[in-house]
Amino acid sequence: MYRTNTCGELRIVNENQEVILCGWVQKSRRMSGIVFVDLRDRYGITQLIFNKKVNLALYNKALELGREWVIQIEGKVVKRFNKNSDIPTGDIEIIVSRLRTLNPSEVPPFTIEENTDGGDDLRMKYRYLDLRRTLIRSNLELRHQMVFAIRNYLNSHEFMEVETPVLINSTPEGARDFIVPSRMNMGEFYSLPQSPQLFKQLLMIAGFDRYFQVVKCFRDEDLRTDRQPEFTQVDCEMSFVEQEDILSIFEGLTKHLFKTIKGLDISGFSRLSYADAIRFYGSDKPDIRFGMQLVEIKDITIGRGFDVFDESEYVGAICAEGCAFYTRKQLDELTDFVKHPQIGAAGLIYVRYSFDGSLKSSVDKFYSTVDLQKWIDRVGAKQGDLVLILYGEKRETQKQLSRLRLEMGSRLGLRDKKQFGCLWVIDFPLFEYDNVLNRFFAKHHPFTSPKQEDVCLLETNPEFVRANAFDMVINGIEIGGGSIRIHNYELQKKIFALLGFSESYTQSQFGFFVDAFKYGAPPHGGIALGLDRFVATFAGLDSIRDCIAFPKNNSGRDTMVGAPSIISRERLSELNLIVEGWQ
C-alpha cells in the first residue's frame, strides 16, 4: 500500500494514528535540530517532523530532500504545537518514523506556489509543473464539479448525451475551419467542427428530442483572453419547444450551478432586447452589475458653434457617480484610454458637477451654464458627479462609450467578481450587412429562424428582420447563445438565397441537411454554452487559459509539446500534399 490517507485529509480527530502518506515536497526548513517538511498532493498539505534527537539517520535523510521530490512516509499523527489556521490540516503534524524517496526531482524552473515567479511563457512550457499549483488545480476541480452538476441536471430533465463526429465536411460562414487531409481520398479534406450544429439538428429530425454533449470544438481564429483554437461547449438541442422553454431550462441550469457550486441563490435573469442593449450599454453583452447607462445628448448640443458635436452622427454620455473630484491627470488618463488605437475615440469631453453646484466643462467656450445644466439633467447627474462624453459615428461611438463605461466601472470597484449579473439578450437581428462585400451575413448562423411577425420583411427589408435568437450573458461575458431553428424546407432555402448562396452551392454544402427537412422535421431549438468561459466566470478569472489543463498560447501554440510542428516530406507525400515555398 502506497498510502493510507491523503495530505489534505488528516485532522485532530486522527491524533495518535499511524499513517502512510505520499506526495511532493513543497518546501523544507531546518530549525533547532528539527527538519520541517511540507508534503503536498492534490488534496492539500501536511507538515512532517524529523527530529535529530529521536532518529539521526532519518533526520539526515530528510536534509537531502529537495523541492518537488516524490516521497513516501510513515509516522504518527500528533497535535501541532504552532497551529496553522491557513490550511485545513493546520492542527496536526506527522512525526515521521520511515522515509522512502520514490523519485528525486531537478530544481523546478519556477516556484510551485500560488504567487509563482514564473512568467506565462515559462509556465506554459512546463505546464505539468504549473498544474501542481493550488490555484490552477482548484480551477480544474471547479471545472469537474461544474461538468458533473451540468450532466446531472440535464439527465434529470430527460436529456440524452450523444456524441457527434469530429471529422466532418467544411461549411461556410463563421470562423475559419481547421482542415484535415484525407490519406485515403486523395485531394479531399475533412474539417474539425466549429460546433455540432447540423448534427444536433439532425438528431432532432431523428426523434431524439432532448440532446446534449460536452464537446470539443475548433475555430481557426485570432486569439484573445477568452478564446482558444480548441474549446469546450455544453451543446444542447430540444424538439417541440418555443424560445421561452429553452430560456427556462437553461436559466434553471445556471441557478442550479450557482446553488450547488457556489451556494448562491440567483434571482431571475433580466431580459434585454439587442436594440436596448446597444442603446443603453453600447454592447450586446452588457455588464449589468452597475448602472452608468449610455445617454444620447446630440439634440441638446447642436447649434452652439461647436463643430465637433454638430458634425457628429452621435453624441453620447455616461455619468460617473461621485467622480467630480477627478484631477486633470486622471482626466488625461481617461482621454489617453479612449484615444488608444484599440478604442479609437477622437477625444473626450467632460462636465464636472461639483458639490457646491457649480459646473465646469472642457467645452465652456461654446456652452453656457444653462446648456450644461440640460446635459446634467438629461443624464441624471447629481452634485459630485462627472459626466463623460464621446462623439462620432453612432455605432462606433457606442462601442467606445461601452469600453469607457467598463473602465470606469473597474476604477470605481463596481465590477466585483464575487457579484453576478445575469441576463438574456434577445431579439437579435437575423442578418448583418457587409458594405465591403455587398451582401448579408447571418448574425448567428444560417439556421436561425426569423420571428414569425417579421417573416413578411424577408422580401422587402431583410435588414429589419429579428431572429428567434438569444445570448446568455453573465458579468458582461457571453456565456452562450442559441435560437429557435428553421424547420421548414422552403424557408431554409429562402434564407440561403438571401445570404447569396446559389442552389448548386447550397446543395453541395448543405444538401444532406436540407434534404432531411423533407422527412418530417419537428420544431426545435437549442443553445451552446461555452464551458471554459462559464468556469472562468465562476472562478473570477481574467483568462480562460487558467481553467484549461493544456491550453494554447496567444499564437495558438502549445510550447510544451511543440505544436503545431513541421512534418516530414515523407508524411506530406503520403497525404499528397506539397508546402509551397518550403526549402
Swiss-Prot record:
GO terms for molecular function: aspartate-tRNA ligase activity; ATP binding; nucleic acid binding. PANTHER family: ASPARTATE--TRNA LIGASE, MITOCHONDRIAL (PTHR22594:SF5), ASPARTYL/LYSYL-TRNA SYNTHETASE (PTHR22594). It is found in: Cytoplasm. InterPro entries: Aa-tRNA-synt_II, aa-tRNA-synth_II, aa-tRNA-synth_II/BPL/LPL, Asp-tRNA-ligase_1, Asp-tRNA-ligase_1_N, Asp/Asn-tRNA-synth_IIb, AspRS_core, GAD-like_sf. It is an enzyme of class 6 (ligase). This is Aspartate--tRNA ligase. Belongs to the class-II aminoacyl-tRNA synthetase family. Type 1 subfamily.
